[in-house]
Amino acid sequence: QTCALPISWEDFEKADFEEVQEDRGSARINRVYRQLSVCPVMYWEKNDDADALYLKNQRQWISKYLKENLGGNLEIYKNMACLTLENDDCYGTVHPRDAMLPEAVLLVCQKIQDELAIGKLEKTENERIFMSRKKFADLVHECRDKWLAGWSKEFREMDEKKLLETIVKYMEDWLMIRCENEQIVIYPATGRLSGVYPDDFKGDVKK
């Protein structure tokens, strides 16, 4: 004999809704951990972004879990979060590293920060900076002109178009910028790391 409990369509709908909510919660947790562990940075547009709220509310536990399993420190800012690793914890390709391209990008990031500080550039409410592709190209070439002696032979002699494409691709890959036709969107990660040569830099030419 089969026994059945009385159940209504409302019960089915409630059960389905609860399962959906549970699935969404699990998906959100997986998404947040995945972004922090395999992506350079995690961004959000609005303060009420569900992933961002989960991250902020659970930052203590997320930070603890990531540190125990991957090392490093969880850093959370207004519209971004990232996992920064010490040298001993690093895995895969890292930024920055001891190579000319990351070094050039650090100088470009510093130039952007300098122009922001003096009012030549402005941030939007969600921490983005919008710049024409030409303006960005001029900024890159200004960095090379200023620090030419410190750049490697390959980068000193690289034509302007290739230099721009090389730096743009690197910064896109590391989620620092996004290209939109003739406009460059600069993301908050650009302000996270930057570099300058020391004040006593004499311009020793790199091979």
Question: Where do the model's predicted regions map?
Answer:
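Long, low-complexity, charged/polar intrinsically disordered regions in eukaryotic proteins
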Residues: 47-118
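Short, contiguous acidic/charged loop-to-helix segments that flank catalytic cores in large enzymes
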Residues: 92-99, 120-128, 149-159, 192, ...
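Glycine-centered, phosphate/nucleic-acid-interacting loop/turn motifs that mediate DNA/RNA or nucleotide
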Residues: 174-175
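Short acidic, hydrophobic short linear motifs in intrinsically disordered regions
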Residues: 38-49, 122-155
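Minor-groove-contacting beta-hairpin "wing" of winged helix-turn-helix DNA-binding domains
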Residues: 81-85, 183-191
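Short amphipathic alpha-helical interaction segments
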Residues: 1, 155-170
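Short, small-residue-biased leader/transition segments that mark boundaries at the very start
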Residues: 3-5
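Extended, charged coiled-coil "stalk/tether" helices of large eukaryotic trafficking and scaffold proteins
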Residues: 188-205
